[in-house]
Amino acid sequence: MPTVDESVSQAIDVFHLPSGVDVSDYEIYEVATSDGVKRLRYPRLDGSKVTSLAKQLVDVRNRTLAAMSVNDILDIVADAAQLWADPDFELRRQAELLIPAITGYEPDMVRIELKRYMRQFRRRELLRFLDSEIGQPSMLDEFRPNKAGGYSKYVGPALTYQVFSSNVPGIPVWSMAMTLLVKGAILGKSS
């Protein structure tokens, strides 16, 4: 029988934290998949860790994301979606294995839906959405003439906190993409 340390080292990290965030306490969730039992690992964070993480996310956002153009962010989101549209992308293959086991959805449905859903995040679709919602996506970068005769610039929140649905995959992706497009950092957790 593996020791706790071996169990943790074999676990799949189902989280992402910025570099420099020190976490020493993890939870392990075991899920039975078509490829055997998989151990999913996520950090256990107390209030002070979450507060520190939120401050760090805002700091990194202010130094990086806030200075990027909306076109650069569009390209990054679209490139990520393109990776996820590829059935050979390792993280997608992992998702296709884990999502049915966690949600009870049929594997074929998950595979088809991942491909279909990722199409919404192509550059053309994202730009079309921004155009329909705010008119001038460049107003996220700089002051631009507005309809009233003055100048306006759209400013998104520095940080959003999102609780992700645990049983309906994909829903958080839209919120995360939109938050990134308005140059906001994201602190999220699964429900």
Give the role of each language-model region.
Residues 1-150:
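N-terminal Rossmann-like NAD(P)+-binding subdomain of aldehyde/semialdehyde dehydrogenases
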Residues 126-191:
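Conserved small-residue-rich beta-alpha loop and adjacent elements
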